[in-house]
Amino acid sequence: EKSIENLLDKNVDLGDYIGLRFLGITLGNSKINDKKNIDSEIKAKNVYVGIMPFRSFLKQKWIVKISPNQAAINIDRDFFKRDESYKNVRSTKKLQSKYELNFNLNKYSDLKFNKAGLKTKVKGNVIYKSSNRQIIANLKSNFDKKGFLKFKFNTKLNQDFLKLDLFSNGLDLENSEYIIGNRKINFKKGTFKSNFKFNKSSKRTFCEGRFSFTNLKIKPEDFAENINSDSTRFFCKDNNLIVNSEKLNYGTLTSNFNLN
């Protein structure tokens, strides 16, 4: 537990030992929470932790498979941030071993971002590589019969590198509430679709594809009237993100606009 706490800069409770399994063990009631906010936590009823011997041998590093069951991810937006004092201590220590963590969410697990209003279920795979502090994820999100959102991302912590793919063939936004920036926005109706890719590196930043909102009706906090739009589209052209909105309406004002 102490080693994992030092690695993650979080409070760690591995829970109860349940028993041995092939090339691993099963733990019960495991949880990880933030040191500054214990209500921001990740927990699971059962967790299988095992070594992947053949891949470990071929790649010459420890590859660990972690499969949580009945997991709940209830975190705030700062959960993955680390104190500067912690970063300075880590930077002075040379990592002695290379390893790879493979998180397998085979069944849908609850995901909630406390201060963003986002609540959904996710399943998929997340890989963490210690050698370059890389995170690779391929996840599918289920919004309780309102539709699905698939996203892939690849990033290297503390480096200027990010790849993001976002896909949905139709996500119903009716009666959803989110916090964007510091403002609460109530989606009274609308549909979100996406086939969007974003890539960023130290040498280049570009995007591909598009995403859109149709039949949109929202009520931002502190706004007197609803904002309505038949169609608002964001699409990439010549490495620019262009916005096109049709019949945008606020109160008595109705217009069409384009932004580049």
Where do the model's predicted regions map?
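Gram-negative outer-membrane beta-barrel proteins
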Residues: 74-76, 109-111, 147, 172-176, ...
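Flexible beta-edge/linker motif
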Residues: 10-11, 15-82, 89-111, 149-154, ...
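Transmembrane beta-strands of outer-membrane beta-barrel pores
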Residues: 70, 107, 143, 170-172, ...
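N-terminal type II signal-anchor transmembrane helix
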Residues: 1-7, 125
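Sec-dependent signal peptide cleavage junction
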Residues: 2, 87-90
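Short, hydrophobic/aromatic-rich segments at coil-to-beta transitions
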Residues: 100-104, 130-139, 237-244
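Amphipathic hydrophobic-ligand
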Residues: 10-11, 36-51, 80, 87, ...
